[in-house]
């Protein structure tokens, strides 16, 4: 195969083609389809030692000393009425994007620059962005969500940052982390060959007079399923964060169960016994899932109904999450409840 810059490819694009080809042929990868909001992205998934090394690099960059490998970021809890008073001090709010949570990592692997995304099941994919600021490859981890904008464009929405260009920022306030993200991406440019567009999540001070207008701008751009609220004064927490809240519409509450047997038993993780325990059953005449599959279910007519398989997860929600979801369904907190609590 020969390339000629005169016939449509610049030297930079030639280098990008060569680099992408080199990575695919020198790393352990397999072609994989990633499903996002009904759209299919064709990416290369790292396998074997290559995936292991990428995850080890993520753990190293994030300074995470947890015994297990996990995504370096917080997991929100569903807000309850008893939590509303917390929102009066230092919180921002944004629509909850309906997509799949990923870590976006820029680093060097085997001495070559790579852009990688990692989901909660620790699946690792190459995301070949074309025009990236060079210093990001010194080691950068962004937290975000892969979604499809209402325009139809696959989009990676950036929430937060752990480390940028080799400098740890997870200990900073959220405002400083957002400033650092924006500065690091000033020379980033979207390219027509990028598999996804990068976008910044808009966090609005929850007490601001125009908060509803700002929320609507994001809701007009993306498919959303509720709201998330973050304390701006806290550093990044790895794992469950009891000061990071989410709220969903009454008909959007879901729980991720694990299929425990062939007769439809659905279970959750019970930390007291350190294993999955049966909770409910689903109707196997309407759908069937393999044992061990994580299935997202919604609560309809007093029963849990499967919505979709969660290929991005390998573990069920725990019993605490389930119990709090039942409280959420009963309390039925709305956006107006949240905003009115700030004025109280």
Sequence positions of predicted segments:
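Conserved loop->alpha-helix
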Residues: 108-149
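Nucleic-acid 5′ end/cap handling module spanning
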Residues: 3, 7-18, 23-32, 38-47, ...
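Short, low-complexity, polar/charged sequence segments that are solvent-exposed and flexible
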Residues: 135, 163, 175-179, 245-250, ...
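Eukaryotic endomembrane system proteins
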Residues: 144-145, 157-159, 164-166, 170-192, ...
């Amino acid at each position: 195969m020969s390339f000629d810059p005169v016939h449509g490819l610049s030297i930079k694009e030639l280098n990008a083609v060569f680099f992408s080809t080199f990575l695919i042929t020198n790393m352990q990868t397999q072609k994989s389809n990633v499903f996002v909001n009904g759209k299919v992205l064709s990416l290369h998934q790292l396998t074997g030692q290559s995936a292991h090394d990428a995850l080890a690099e993520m753990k190293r960059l994030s300074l995470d000393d947890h015994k297990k490998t996990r995504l370096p970021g917080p997991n929100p809890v569903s807000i309850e009425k008893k939590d509303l008073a917390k929102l009066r001090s230092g919180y921002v709010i944004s629509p909850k994007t309906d997509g799949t949570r990923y870590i976006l990592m820029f680093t060097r692997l085997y001495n070559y620059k790579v852009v990688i995304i990692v989901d909660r099941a620790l699946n690792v994919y190459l995301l070949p962005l074309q025009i990236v600021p060079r210093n990001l490859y010194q080691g950068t981890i962004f937290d975000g969500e892969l979604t499809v904008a209402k325009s139809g464009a696959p989009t990676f929405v950036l929430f937060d940052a752990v480390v940028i260009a080799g400098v740890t920022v997870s200990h900073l306030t959220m405002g400083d982390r957002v400033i650092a993200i924006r500065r690091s991406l000033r020379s980033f440019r979207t390219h027509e060959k990028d598999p996804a567009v990068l976008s910044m999540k808009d966090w609005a001070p929850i007490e601001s007079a125009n908060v509803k207008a700002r929320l609507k701008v994001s809701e007009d751009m993306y498919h959303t399923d509720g709201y998330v609220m973050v304390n701006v004064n806290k550093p990044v927490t790895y794992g469950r964060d009891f000061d990071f809240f989410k709220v969903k519409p009454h008909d959007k509450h879901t729980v991720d169960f694990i299929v425990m047997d062939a007769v439809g038993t659905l279970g959750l993780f019970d930390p007291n016994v350190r294993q999955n325990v049966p909770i409910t059953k689903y109707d196997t005449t309407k759908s069937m899932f393999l044992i061990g599959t994580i299935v997202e279910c919604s609560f309809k007519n007093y029963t849990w109904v499967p919505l979709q398989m969660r290929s991005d997860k390998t573990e069920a929600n725990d019993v605490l999450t389930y119990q709090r979801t039942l409280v959420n369904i009963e309390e039925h907190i709305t956006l107006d409840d949240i905003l009115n609590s700030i004025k109280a």
